[in-house]
């Protein structure tokens, strides 16, 4: 999906659920306690694209949880992320949880992963259920989450691709 497509889908999803143009511009907290570690991963790259997309659509973005914000967007499933979502909800903030992980992705990923996959599923369900809106990158993962019994609103938004990295003149 090209960056412009991602921006339009993101903006439509955010407007549908949280846009506060009549009051003031929305401010989104892109939360990751271990941001520097996460940024080295595929999820971290998705976070960078999300930030660029939001800013490109005139949405103010912060990564500092001490700042005031309207919506917290969480991409990871660490305990600190779960507790941030709970804190935000308690303060009346909206929570967008990006569901990058499923039990099916976790299974067979390392020796012994199948033994703890049921616990992993319980944990991610607990995390994702804190979201007012759950974003997931594929229809397949959406169907898995629905199959888990998650009742929260789930929208599919493919992770963006920076098409400037694939210019014809760069393929020489």
Please provide the spans of the model-predicted regions:
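N-terminal subdomain of nucleotide-sugar transferases
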Residues: 1-66
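Acceptor-binding helix/loop patch of EC 2.4 sugar-transfer enzymes
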Residues: 33, 97-122, 148
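Short N-terminal targeting/anchoring amphipathic segment
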Residues: 61-80, 96
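Active-site proximal beta-strand in glycosyltransferases
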Residues: 71-73, 87-106, 135, 155
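Short, well-ordered alpha-helical microsegments
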Residues: 80-83, 142
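Membrane-proximal helix-turn-helix segments that form the acceptor-binding/catalytic region
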Residues: 90, 115-134
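Carbohydrate-associated surface elements
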Residues: 140, 157-160
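Acidic anion/phosphate-binding donor-loop and adjacent secondary structure
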Residues: 146, 161-172
């Amino acid at each position: 999906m090209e960056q412009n497509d991602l921006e339009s889908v993101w903006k439509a999803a955010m407007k549908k659920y949280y846009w506060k143009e009549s009051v003031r511009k929305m401010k989104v907290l892109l939360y990751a306690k271990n941001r520097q570690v996460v940024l080295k991963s595929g999820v971290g790259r998705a976070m960078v694209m999300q930030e660029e997309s939001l800013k490109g659509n005139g949405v103010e973005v912060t990564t500092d949880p001490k700042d005031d914000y309207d919506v917290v967007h969480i991409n990871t499933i660490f305990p600190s992320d779960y507790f941030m979502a709970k804190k935000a909800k308690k303060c009346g903030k909206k929570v967008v949880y990006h569901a990058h992980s499923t039990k099916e992705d976790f299974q067979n990923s390392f020796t012994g992963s199948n033994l703890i996959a049921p616990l992993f599923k319980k944990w991610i369900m607990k995390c994702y259920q804190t979201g007012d809106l759950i974003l997931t990158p594929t229809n397949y993962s959406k169907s898995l989450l629905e199959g888990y019994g998650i009742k929260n609103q789930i929208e599919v938004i493919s992770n963006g691709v920076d098409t400037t990295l694939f210019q014809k003149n760069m393929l020489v």
